[in-house]
Amino acid sequence: MCDDEVAALVVDNGSGMCKAGFAGDDAPRAVFPSIVGRPRHQGVMVGMGQKDSYVGDEAQSKRGILTLKYPIEHGIITNWDDMEKIWHHTFYNELRVAPEEHPVLLTEAPLNPKANREKMTQIMFETFNSPAMYVAIQAVLSLYASGRTTGIVLDSGDGVSHTVPIYEGYALPHAILRLDLAGRDLTDYLMKILTERGYSFTTTAEREIVRDIKEKLCYVALDFEQEMATAAASTSLEKSYELPDGQVITIGNERFRCPESLFQPSFLGMESCGIHETVYNSIMKCDVDIRKDLYANIVMSGGTTMYPGIADRMQKEITSLAPSTIKIKIIAPPERKYSVWIGGSILASLSTFQQMWISKEEYDESGPGIVHRKCF
């Protein structure tokens, strides 16, 4: 197979959104929700061409009549049949490519179970007949995208957050920490506190509206108590939002109370540490000699790190935890929503990477276990 002309595909499967495109591009061509929807009711209109399942944006637009399911929970694929539908949709409908003609780079969550990597490998070679594939860890790709090989990545998406310390390009598995607190939990929490305000959001379709409110209006306060006082004393922090039916709702302290849960998970009734402590704990699990390099390269990635104010707050919180002499730098690139994908695009287009692919021949010879030997 001549690698000169065939572009590799890069597919970043997140819990909330799937990002897909071609290696060498600077942004994904396709970004769509990782959703599979099935009709709640029997079709009555003859000849309407009703399907038994819908994927991505189409599922999203027909959400009123569908039950929506996310095949990826907390960053890890739990429903393989639906996942196959998502990949099929990615190749044939979004990118419009024949998967058997392109090498494909997939991404995985840190600490992904071994059986899962094998299953991904098997599906790519056996269902989609890929000529070659590779599985890369999401956080490592984000670090590449920021132009570094050493640093600690806080990757927070829709389903899960991880802190991943990376030294000279290798993730340090003993120091990776996972926090099951991410965008979807914040959306649920916003639904809850808006309900307390008298607005009712309950269905899966309404959850998507709340997600939009969250993405457009929420921010992280530098000082939570002070912000609460400001919100109580004036209406300066209030914003209005128009619902799809034309009703206008007003949202005040919910704007920063919602993402505050990242720093105070007790808001959600969770006993875990906030993201700032998780980053600190992760650094403390690393060798004392490399901590200085990690503190100076704290890289944020993923959609849940997109809140205005999050980097400044992180800087403040880590500064109060870390030794006073240490230099702390938070890197929050503007494109961090897609930095995993961008890192994959960079990696798959490097000439030095070309010998890293797992080829169909190697797979046929060794079986799915090959993924553990070639992708690390």
Curated annotation (Swiss-Prot):
List, alphabetically, the Pfam families matched: Actin
MF terms in GO: ATP binding; hydrolase activity
Name the InterPro entries for this protein.
Actin, Actin/actin-like_CS, Actin_CS, ATPase_NBD
**EC number from the UniProt entry:** 3.6.4.-
Which GO BP terms apply?
mitotic cytokinesis; ovarian fusome organization; regulation of synapse organization
Q: Cite the PROSITE patterns for this sequence.
A: ACTINS_1, ACTINS_2, ACTINS_ACT_LIKE
Superkingdom of the organism of origin? Eukaryota
Gene3D superfamilies, sorted = 3.30.420.40, Actin, Chain A, domain 4 (3.90.640.10)
Kindly state which reaction or reactions the protein catalyses. ATP + H2O = ADP + phosphate + H(+)
Recorded GO cellular component terms are: actin cytoskeleton; cytoplasm; plasma membrane
* N-acetylaspartate modifications at: 3
Give the enzyme class.
hydrolase
Q: Which residues form the propeptide?
A: 1-2
Q: How is it modified after translation?
A: N-terminal cleavage of acetylated cysteine of immature actin by ACTMAP. Oxidation of Met-45 by Mical to form methionine sulfoxide promotes actin filament depolymerization. Methionine sulfoxide is produced stereospecifically, but it is not known whether the (S)-S-oxide or the (R)-S-oxide is produced.
Q: Which keywords, in A-to-Z order, does the entry hold?
A: Acetylation, ATP-binding, Cytoplasm, Cytoskeleton, Hydrolase, Methylation, Nucleotide-binding, Oxidation
Q: Which residues carry this modification: Methionine sulfoxide?
A: 45, 48
Carrying Tele-methylhistidine, the residues are 74
Q: Where in the cell is it found?
A: Cytoplasm, Cytoskeleton
Q: What is its main location?
A: cytoplasm
| Secretion signal span | none
**The protein's role, per its UniProt record:** Actins are highly conserved proteins that are involved in various types of cell motility and are ubiquitously expressed in all eukaryotic cells.
What does the sequence similarity comment in the record state about its family? Answer: Belongs to the actin family.
More about this protein:
In Drosophila there are 6 closely related actin genes.
Could you identify this protein by its name?
Answer: Actin-57B
Organism, by scientific name, is Drosophila melanogaster
